[in-house]
Amino acid sequence: MPRPRPLLLAVMAATLADIILAADPAPAGPAPRPPNFLLIMADDLGIGDLGCYGNKTLRTPHLDRLAREGVKLTQHLAAAPLCTPSRAAFLTGRYPPRSGMAAHGRVGVYLFTASSGGLPPSEVTMARLLKGRGYATALIGKWHLGLSCRGATDFCHHPLRHGFDRFLGVPTTNLRDCRPGAGTVFGPALRVFAAGPLAALGASLAAMAAARWAGLARVPGWALAGTAAAMLAVGGPRSASCLGFRPANCFLMDDLAVAQRPTDYGGLTRRLADEAALFLRRNRARPFLLFLSFLHVHTAHFADPGFAGRSLHGAYGDSVEEMDWGVGRVLAALDELGLARETLVYFTSDHGAHVEELGPRGERMGGSNGVFRGGKGNNWEGGVRVPCLVRWPRELSPGRVVAEPTSLMDVFPTVARLAGAELPGDRVIDGRDLMPLLRGDAQRSEHEFLFHYCNAYLQAVRWHNGSAVWKAFYFTPNFAPAGANGCFSTHVCLCAGPAHVTAHDPPLLFDLTRDPGERRPLTPEAEPRHREVLDAIDAAARAHRARLRPAPDQLAPRHLMWKPWLQLWGGGGAGGGAGAQDDSGHAHGDGSHAHDDPGHAQDRGDDDAHYGGHATTRTQATPR
């Protein structure tokens, strides 16, 4: 038998080795640690307010740094042009009507802490999903999604019931009425929302009383008493709330306790930024989700002495620049702790700038939406197109720009997938994973259609087909005065009623690729595909509505009104019983979160020159 040749033996050995290696591959290296998440949201910030989006006069160096080091999105869209529904959609990845967080009436946000509406406990937030994956979770800043349902301390809508381990912030929002000398929103609100019903009830009461006194008709006493009670129900709570609004509604909570009443705006931005840095420090050894929700730049405007009067845009500009400082302070904490590479940082605004905000002398107190029409409260691009910056050094190339349509709702599935959490299978999730676009693996958004709601009413639909982005309006707000860029007579545009909106049949159609400012509606004569585009959009709208399950209206008048038995006083958490627990049943209230970590000095950095180098004293939580 001939002996095998050496070359043949070598080939056979190599082949056998390949087979063995293919059948039993070498063990892979350890899987990368799931990222941390720092999600930052401004309030009422316009896309035209940041240097990285073209502003040349406001100083936003820390946000501009995020843009350079990460990805900038230029067609990022709020799911609603108002605070409450937009934030509900952000945390759940769902259009606001799916959770009942879209009003059928005129008022679309919570004004009182003692209202019974809020984000339903049945909704699944990103915090709840990530908490189930072992993440530490915190919300610092503004909530605005309700507090309690039936009693002042049941806290059914509280952040701790929605997956957050830690909450330091305001349960509702920042309003002019919260800061002495900043004016009021209730004068216009009473005029717009209560004047008509009160006038009608008053006229009825006067007519019945006159008829009874003159003997012209037999008017029972219960009719007079009932009408008077109705007047009290309409005007009384609002008037009482106006008189005592600040102590009742403007307070800072530390978990379940009232930590400060009324809110002290001095050093508030520093306090929130320091609390965020402290949370990072305490949880640097485990994955975390931190939602930093600034009160800036909603009125009432505020800024510490180091920022007040420094900007070229008055109190509004001062607020923007102080907020940017706060962002920088938290980014510096990530750097100091060596966490920047492993942390996905996301920055946005809940909706566009409030263009109707004016000062006592008529000066502009709101922000800039750049070239875009409209603003907060309506679905023109200025109301829903918001800044968006995403940085994750481990995964994302710096300096990229994504111009595709994306949504605040996309953060929910993106965060869930990266954390290894399973999306809930018993409900529709409207958001889409952003990572293929952010990495550059995909060039097209997964959103073919996006639906723009004004409260519970579908106002417009966006269609991204091919290279075009079409937008069709079923109704548009009536700007007042005529020719203005907002609804100055009502302080914000309303969503229904012939005096406030104009219906369009056929819908008003724009091509945002050619006309991003929505100045030139298309006609059948100018656009050959006019009918084809509208037919496709109408079909998508019908299919979308067919998938909407009715949900209890959390912004119905009965849930919006002030209810004295829900008013939270004192420490709030004392004797809370079952109410003093988070969504997993863990009790809170030992006050341990209220103290600075004594083992770590808080480096102040060069930016503290704005504050004169003084540390801020943190108010302890009221004992519970």
From Swiss-Prot:
Glycan-linked positions: 55, 465
Listed Basic and acidic residues bias regions: 583-611
Alphabetical list of Gene3D superfamilies matching this protein: 3.30.1120.10, Alkaline Phosphatase, subunit A, Helix hairpin bin
Signal peptide (residue range): 1-22
Cysteine-cysteine disulfides: 149-156, 178-250, 454-495, 487-493
Active site (catalytic residues): 83 (nucleophile), 144
Lumenal compartment residues: 24-192, 243-624
MF terms in GO: metal ion binding; steryl-sulfatase activity; sulfuric ester hydrolase activity
Residues reported in the UniProt entry to bind Ca(2+): 43-44, 83, 350-351
Chemical reaction(s) catalysed: dehydroepiandrosterone 3-sulfate + H2O = 3beta-hydroxyandrost-5-en-17-one + sulfate + H(+); estrone 3-sulfate + H2O = estrone + sulfate + H(+)
Main location: membrane
Cofactor dependence: Ca(2+)
Stretches assigned to the Cytoplasmic side: 217-220
TM helices/strands, residue ranges: 193-216, 221-242
Keywords: Calcium, Disulfide bond, Endoplasmic reticulum, Glycoprotein, Hydrolase, Lipid metabolism, Membrane, Metal-binding, Microsome, Pregnancy, Signal, Steroid metabolism, Transmembrane, Transmembrane helix
Superkingdom as given in the UniProt entry: Eukaryota
Membrane topology: Multi-pass membrane protein
GO BP terms in the entry: female pregnancy; steroid metabolic process
Subunit annotation: Homodimer.
Protein role: Catalyzes the conversion of sulfated steroid precursors, such as dehydroepiandrosterone sulfate (DHEA-S) and estrone sulfate to the free steroid.
Family indicated by similarity: Belongs to the sulfatase family.
Name of the protein this chain belongs to: Steryl-sulfatase
Provenance organism: Mus musculus (Mouse)
This protein's encoding gene: Sts
